[in-house]
Amino acid sequence: MEDINSELNEQKRKVDFNSYDMSVKELISMVNDGLIDIAPEYQRQFRWDALRQSTLIESIFLGIPVPSLFMATNPDGTWEVIDGVQRLSSIINFAAEKDSSARKKIKKEIPLQLCGLKKMKSFNEKDFKCLPRSLQIDFLLKPLKITTLSDKSDKSIRFDLFERLNTGGIKLSDQEIRSCIFSCLLYTSDAADD
């Protein structure tokens, strides 16, 4: 029984998390400023269609809880997205300025035009700039849950977390799987050198 407890305690020491509530505006600003890497090598590309993006935006407007965004802290203090690329990219696609670096990072020049909304039908066919200023401010100030894996955590944990959080979602392409494995091997090699 003591072996079980010591194994659990040893593994728990490898993981160190922090939790935050951050506004949509803060997150977009952090991506713009290069403080959040929205597409680390092991992460999938932005794939959600307009309907799925619109449903997320509607949920945020309505105050319906959305899953936390999971980030890993790099040694330089920047964050990289472990889980939530689709959600964060959708938010950027809807609310980021047209010529912003955040929009360029998701490779979407034309802002999301909401569609298929069932609760907020009058929002359909509108983009962020078409909304009244009060609604724009309301959206930008909405808080989202952020969980960050600190840089004190074992480097292999971020790949374990990525795998656990992404099981059952949109299937990774063969190239995304290869990128994840290659990045994991590089991190493992770097960790061995440390």
Regions found by a protein language model. Give the residues of each.
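Conserved small/polar residues in nucleotide/adenosyl-binding loops
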Residues: 187-194
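Non-catalytic, well-ordered alpha-helical scaffold segments
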Residues: 25, 54, 89, 155-159, ...
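N-terminal leader or domain-start segments enriched in small/polar residues
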Residues: 1-79, 93-111
